[in-house]
């Protein structure tokens, strides 16, 4: 199990002009606060307990399925881990999956999960969590902005999304996201995905932030608010959220 660390992500704005107009007292206070923040960040980095990243605006969402912005993605990639990762050499490597195989016809991808995977609350994470998360991406009720992009090539996608009319986009049948051909083994050790057509870059899709797993019980219990509070924010990456002050820091 990977050691969970707390994220200290500072959000800063360009306030120079405003501070100058506020007089020496405000400037002195701002400088003191800035120095204190910098000192804390430096100490955390030096001890190996954290790092500071300027993100920009407050993330609209930290739900991997719903995010479509860079500011959210920059945080998501530190607190979640998908099946695969792309390393510094632009090579696809194992993430939550230790290995993967592709059938000769390119239609079946099988991922073998690492042993001992855990959620940030200490509960077991298995291939079944990825099955749920991928089907959630296809569920029209989720309205995932990248849903079609990342799971649209998986067999059963049309049925999962209600066979939308090509001209109007209106659903013509009742959505059945269980029709999506993603299946976890009974022991949760392997995840098998059947595609409608060969997709040679599906390994890179499997490394996309939107393909990160979410914990079913947490999402279903808390609804959309699950990813807005540290006490309900369950993740699986190397870092976890301990504090979120909107428009200030995470």
Give the location of each predicted region.
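Aromatic- and charge-enriched surface segment that lines or borders ligand/interaction sites
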Residues: 98-149, 192
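Bacterial lipoprotein signal-peptidase II cleavage site
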Residues: 22-34
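Short, well-ordered beta-strand elements
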Residues: 47-57, 108-111, 130-133, 191-193, ...
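Gly/Pro-rich hinge or "lid" segments in bacterial periplasmic/extracellular proteins
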Residues: 177, 195-250
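Immediate post-signal peptide segment of exported/extracytoplasmic ligand-binding proteins
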Residues: 35-52
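Sec-dependent N-terminal signal peptides of Gram-positive bacterial secreted proteins and lipoproteins
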Residues: 3-24
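N-terminal lobe/hinge region of extracytoplasmic solute-binding protein
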Residues: 54-104, 234-235
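Surface-exposed binding/hinge segments that line
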Residues: 131, 145-217
């Amino acid at each position: 199990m990977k050691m969970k660390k707390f994220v200290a992500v500072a959000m800063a704005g360009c306030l120079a002009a405003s501070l100058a107009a506020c007089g020496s007292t405000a400037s002195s206070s701002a400088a003191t606060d800035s120095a204190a923040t910098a000192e804390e960040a430096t100490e955390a980095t030096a001890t190996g307990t954290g790092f500071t990243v300027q993100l920009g605006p407050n993330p609209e969402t930290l739900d991997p399925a719903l995010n479509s912005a860079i500011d959210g993605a920059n945080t998501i990639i530190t607190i979640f881990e998908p099946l695969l990762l792309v390393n510094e050499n632009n090579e696809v490597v194992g993430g939550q999956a230790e290995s993967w195989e592709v059938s000769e016809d390119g239609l079946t991808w099988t991922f073998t999960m690492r042993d001992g995977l855990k959620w940030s609350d200490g509960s077991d994470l298995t291939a079944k969590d990825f099955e749920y998360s991928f089907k959630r991406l296809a569920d029209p009720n989720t309205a995932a902005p990248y849903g079609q992009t990342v799971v649209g090539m998986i067999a059963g996608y049309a049925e999962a999304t209600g066979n939308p009319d090509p001209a109007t986009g209106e659903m013509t049948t009742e959505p059945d996201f269980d029709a999506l051909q993603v299946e976890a083994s009974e022991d949760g050790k392997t995840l098998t995905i059947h595609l409608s057509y060969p997709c040679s870059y599906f390994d890179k899709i499997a490394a996309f932030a939107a393909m990160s797993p979410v914990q079913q019980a947490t999402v279903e219990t808390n609804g959309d608010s699950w990813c807005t509070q540290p006490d309900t924010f369950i993740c699986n990456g190397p870092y976890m959220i301990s504090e979120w002050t909107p428009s200030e820091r995470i």
